């Protein structure tokens, strides 16, 4: 774990089994994550291109997380930016985005995408994201109902 400027939080890129369980608990706090199982969360973390966590430096408890799927050159898509409810309002979502977007492996990526609720636009705009108006629209093929 790397300290964040002597703050009580540390960056995590490799997650212990205990932290994977804590990640599952964090996912369960989200409106979209209630049906996701521990095993599914474990698979998701293992197969993401880049995962960033924030942990309480004293206890090691995982309190924030985000991830990206990317080819590390043309495109990246950020998913699952989340901070434990007990730690929200301390700027940790921004620390997650800063750490992910400025990660050495992300420096050659041409465009970084994310999807969010419109109420979150002002938050993400502070990190340079904008509503993407293009000639194309995202399409989805549902192969199973989202958990």
Per-segment meaning from a language model:
Residues 1-38, 55, 135:
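Short amphipathic alpha-helix that is part of the acyltransferase structural core
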Residues 40-58, 62-82:
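A conserved beta-strand-loop-helix scaffold within acyl/acetyltransferase catalytic domains
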Residues 84, 117:
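Residue-level recognition of the GNAT/N-acetyltransferase active site
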Residues 87, 91-96:
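Conserved acetyl-CoA pyrophosphate-binding loop and the N-cap/start of the following alpha-helix
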Residues 102-116:
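Conserved GNAT acetyl-CoA-binding A-motif
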Residues 111-115, 125, 130-147:
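Conserved catalytic-core motifs of GNAT/GCN5-like acyltransferases
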